[in-house]
Structures are given as C-alpha cells and as structure tokens.
From Swiss-Prot:
Keywords: Amino-acid biosynthesis, Aromatic amino acid biosynthesis, Decarboxylase, Isomerase, Lyase, Multifunctional enzyme, Tryptophan biosynthesis
Residue numbers spanned by region Indole-3-glycerol phosphate synthase: 1-253
Protein species of origin: Helicobacter pylori (strain ATCC 700392 / 26695)
Record-linked NCBIfam families: PRK09427.1
Name of this chain's protein: Tryptophan biosynthesis protein TrpCF
Function: Bifunctional enzyme that catalyzes two sequential steps of tryptophan biosynthetic pathway. The first reaction is catalyzed by the isomerase, coded by the TrpF domain; the second reaction is catalyzed by the synthase, coded by the TrpC domain.
Region N-(5'-phosphoribosyl)anthranilate isomerase, residue ranges: 254-448
Gene: trpC
C-alpha cells in the first residue's frame, strides 16, 4: 500500500503539469529582495509561522481562512511567514504567496513538495523569498539543480531532513538552512524528540529549524537551546483567536494581577499578556469594586480577566463571573467540596484556578480534580500580594501544568522562567504603589519574556 508521501508525489506530477499550463513565466525573474536567512538570525529564537488551510493528517484545519487577517496577525510575531502552495492535500496555492507577500514585510517561504524548477521560478514570481527542498523527495542531482536555481534567484533554501540517512546525505551536498521534520511523512505521526535525536548529528554552526508537532510554549522552551527557530502551522491555524494562540505559543500564558485602572489593563494587553487579574477581596490594598471592575473589562474586552476570591460565597462569585464575563476564578481557601460546587455553578467558559499556598515541599498537595489549573503562591500573612517568593526548586518534579505567583519581579524573572510554569503571575513587582502599575516595567518585562 502506497504511503501518504508516495501518493502526494504521484499527484504532484499532475499538479506541476497544470501549473505549467496555467502560468506563463517572464524571461527574466527578479531576484529576491527580502533576506529570509538574515531574518531568522535577528532573534535568539525565530519563528516561521505558517498559513495552512488543511493537511493530510488533519483534513480541514481552518474553515475561516482569511489570508489578510492571518498575515496581519503574523506580522506582529513572525520572523518569516510560510505559505502552503500544494493544492490537493493542503488546499494551498501559489497565488496565496502573492497575497501574503503583498501584505507583509516579512520574508516568505514557499512550502510545497518541490520536484521541478518551474515551481521555484513560479514561487519567486509570486513573491517567495525562500523555498523548501526535501531530501525525502529529491535525489542528489535534482536537489543540487534546484538548490542552485534558488540561490541564483537570491532565495534562501530550507532543506528538510527527517532521519539519520538523510542527514548523512545532506552533509555531502550543499545546504543553507536545515529543517528537522518531527513528522514521519509515511505515517504522518509526530514526535518532537526527533529534533533532540537528530540535532547532534548536524554541524554546531548550522542554522537549524524544528518543524511539525509544535503545540505549546513548554515544547518551545524545551527545544529552544538546541535549535535556531521553529516552523509552526497546524497548532496556530486550528485556534479561533489566532493572536492569542501566537502569544501563548511564543510567550506563554502570563498574567498581571491587581489591576485597578483601565490604562494599566490596556498596557497589559498591548504587551501581550493573556490574563489580567481583578481582586475582589476587601482586605487587599488592590481590592476593586465589581462595578469599577466592569468598566475595565468593558474597556479592554480582548484581555482575559481572572477574578481573585478569598472564601467568598458561591452565589457572590457566580454573580460577579456572569456580570464581568470572567474567563477564570482564582480561589484562595476553598475546600475540594466547595470547588466542586462552584464548578457546577459557573459557566463552562470560566476556568477554576486552585491556589496552593506554599512555603516548603510538604505544602505541595495534589490539585483538586474539579480545578482546571493550580496556581502556586507564597504562603504568607495575606492571601496573595505578599511580595515574597518561595523556594521554586521544590516545584522541580511537578508534572501537571501550573501558574507561578509570589514576589515575581524584574530582578528574579530569569530565575522564574527556568521553573517551566505554564505562565507567570505578576503583581506588586510591576507597581508604583498598590494597584498602580508601572507601564515601563510592564514593557521591560514583555521584552524579557521574549529573550530566549
């Protein structure tokens, strides 16, 4: 029985024949004027974000495939943009390259199963600045001919390898940028450990991109020390809110708590934090009345707001969640039974964050099954907002996703990032005074979160 790759290549011959019938190439094709490789080297870790409507493994991924909206979002986060050109299996086109190129300043990668010089010339004519060449598809002679053609058009070449044999082969040939594909193209299964296994076989100074199977910020942080960047498509394309998906993938799910002003909430959203915290505990210096909180949630609708509650009644929490359309509740001092009751009372769109106050390893009790997430905070005189941290090394063996809070600031952020939390929860460390955030500190923090 033919593999998926064999079927694709069989159909690709017919598709290339159709492309030649439907597109006339000019005698002289303008060379690429955007440096794909240079763009990948501008940050310590780069991202090639992909426009992908469908795939053989997942079928239709993004029904609302609005290229202009996708391009506009990627412009904020991508080092380069990849565009699928395969029509039958990915529902892409070479015309899509032109659309993205015309509406973006980023270098564009033509992603196709390239077997013919015509595809490279057409890709360049449409505005592509780089092409993907796959050693699983090409023999040495064809690979070198296509590689040299692309370079003659001033295009970068992303050469894809997927096993040791292909790497040994590549090292005898020419290469520009190397992509390690975590997907088996014959079975379509993915394994990100593939990158870790194959990276040591490649030269230390090679520019390496990890491709396929990248779904989370945790995976990014685990692989980032070994590669120069990532090519990500499916995990972003399947999400309705593409901007939020990009932020979660690249920066993690971070939060600024204790918001009391609209201007601070706007600064938090503008600097790509996912969550804004509103404290409804009256003893807190950052307490906010529900009617004042409503003004903030209405003014910054795209920020996901989390309500912080300390031993309040289920009825009160339910009322505030509904009124403010909170995306999560952060609970201090609630029993397993109370959390279970609250889960039944709240809409399914509202997550439950169970706070576990910690000072030593003996405080690391398991998450209540009804809670969506654990948030570890420092045990202190107050329920949160103590401004001190605990020994984060005790979290080393925690395997379930968690948020980290307690005394986080610009001085200890680098250490906190090594804890590998799902997200970090900042409060007093970003303030001028209780409840009044420092916009410059928020900006500086956002920059640090991207410095990996």
């Amino acid at each position: 029985m033919p593999s998926v790759l064999e079927n694709i290549l069989k159909d690709k011959l017919l598709e290339v024949s159709d492309l030649k019938k439907n597109h006339a190439l000019p005698i002289n094709i303008n060379p690429s004027d955007r440096d794909f490789k240079k763009a990948l080297l501008e940050k310590k870790t780069s991202f090639i974000l992909e426009c992908k409507k469908a795939s053989p493994s997942k079928g239709l991924i993004r029904k609302d495939f609005d290229l202009l909206k996708i391009t506009k979002t990627y412009e904020k986060f991508a080092s380069c943009i990849s565009v699928l050109a395969d029509s039958k299996y990915f529902l892409g086109s070479y015309e899509n390259i032109k659309i993205v190129s015309q509406h973006s300043t980023k270098p564009i990668l033509c992603k196709d199963f390239i077997i013919d010089a015509f595809q490279i010339k057409l890709a360049r004519m449409m505005g592509a600045n780089a092409v993907l060449l796959m050693l699983s598809v090409l023999d040495d002679k064809n690979y070198l001919e296509l590689f040299n053609l692309a370079k003659s058009l001033n295009m970068s070449v992303l050469t894809e390898v997927s096993n040791q044999q292909e790497i040994e082969h590549l090292l005898k040939l020419q290469y520009d940028i190397i992509g390690i594909n975590n997907r088996d193209l014959h079975t379509l299964k993915t394994d990100i450990n593939h990158t870790l296994k194959l990276r040591p076989l490649l030269p230390k100074d090679a520019l390496i991109i990890s491709e396929s199977g990248i779904y989370s910020h945790a995976q990014i942080k685990a692989l980032a020390p070994y590669v120069n960047g990532f090519l990500v498509g499916s995990s972003l394309m399947k999400e309705k809110d593409l901007k939020k998906a990009c932020i979660k993938l690249i920066l993690g799910e971070n939060k600024v708590c204790g918001l009391t002003r609209i201007k601070d909430a706007k600064a938090v959203y503008k600097n790509h934090f996912i969550y804004g915290g509103l404290i409804f505990e009256k003893s807190s210096p950052r307490y906010i009345k529900p009617k004042e909180a409503l003004k903030i949630t209405k003014a910054v609708k795209k920020l996901d707001f989390v309500g912080v509650f300390v031993k309040d009644s289920i009825k009160k929490i339910q009322k505030i969640v509904k009124k403010l359309d909170l995306k999560a509740v952060q609970l201090y001092g609630y029993s397993q039974k109370e959390i279970a009751q609250l889960k039944k009372a709240l809409p399914k769109t509202c997550a439950i964050w169970q706070v576990i106050s910690v000072m030593s390893a003996k405080d690391l009790v398991p998450k209540t099954k009804e809670a969506s997430l654990i948030l570890y905070d420092t045990k202190g005189d107050k329920m949160g907002g103590n401004g001190v941290s605990f020994d984060w090394e005790i979290l080393e063996n925690v395997k379930t996703p968690f948020m980290l809070a307690g005394g986080l600031n610009l001085d200890n952020i680098q250490k906190a990032l090594k804890v590998e939390a799902l997200g970090l929860d900042f409060n007093s460390g970003l303030e001028i005074s209780p409840g009044i955030k420092n916009k410059d500190k928020i900006k500086r923090l956002a920059r640090i979160l991207r410095e990996y």
